[in-house]
Amino acid sequence: MNRPASRAVAIGVAAAMACATLVAVPHMAQAQPEAQTNAKKDVQVIAFQQTWNTVAKECTSTYGPEGVAYVEVSPPQESIQGTQWWTSYQPVSYKLDSKLGTEAEFKNMIKQCNAVGVDIIADVVLNQTTGADVADGKQTGVAGTEYNGSTGDYPGFATEQYPEGITASDFHSCSKNISNYANQQEVQECRLSSMWDFDSESEKVQDIQSDYLAALWNAGVRGFRMDAVKHIHTDSMKAIKEKFAKKIGVNADSIYWIQEVIGNSSEAAGIQP
């Protein structure tokens, strides 16, 4: 899959900033030893493509002692097979078993990080499922869930309310790749790099996705970085967030919520940050 170059650059910059922040903290602590109270700050580390066990160890050895407030981890849901970073952005179910670790390891990471005052932010993929990177016909995800990227059948997204999971009717009807970013409808209803585009206006899709967010919250996640939000209708994203907030019994505005929108003045006004 050819992900936009701007995303790769943004990730690299964010990672560099995170590393730079960590380098600076010990120096400050040495200069002001009386301030070593490890009070919760707003420092955030992006642990891009790090395993859950690695993050857990870093929380204990570095992030907690240095006063880091949040660690953002890569998408925790099951995805297509492969070691490339972008495979994490092609979900085949919302099971918390991924190439970065099992559900048990994910929950243990959160527990270990919380114990030293660090909260977890999850990178969340709601815009799409799989694209042309997977072979035709039936395939299996990293946790063994079957899906068919040719026909748009993803039974792994099943919930108690929707036991059939996701089918082709749960995606937008536009099957072409996005090419005209000045056309808001095309950007939000056609396919990003060939990936099936969720019909985010659908009550069913909103219910399944808000259930996933609630599952993350119940596992201990306390922040959400929403991927590719410029490709989701604003009203749909708001509805999903409100459904999620209702399910966990909190005010939607109180949730730590980050939306990825890469601005470009040449693109449609409705998809700008």
Task: Label every PLM stretch briefly.
Residues M1-A31:
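Secretory targeting and sorting signals
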Residues R7, K99-A104, Q112, K204-I208:
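Short, motif-level signal for alpha-helix interfacial/capping segments enriched in acidic residues
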Residues E34-V45, W52, K57-G64, V68-A69, ...:
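Active-site-proximal helices and loops of the catalytic beta/alpha 8
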Residues A39-D42, S79-K111, E146-G149, D153-D199:
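Aromatic- and acidic-residue-enriched carbohydrate-binding clefts of CAZyme catalytic domains
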Residues V43-T54, M195-Q206:
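Active-site mouth loops of central-metabolism enzymes
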Residues A47, L96-S98, A228:
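Short glycine-centered, acidic/aromatic-flanked micro-motifs in structured strand/loop junctions
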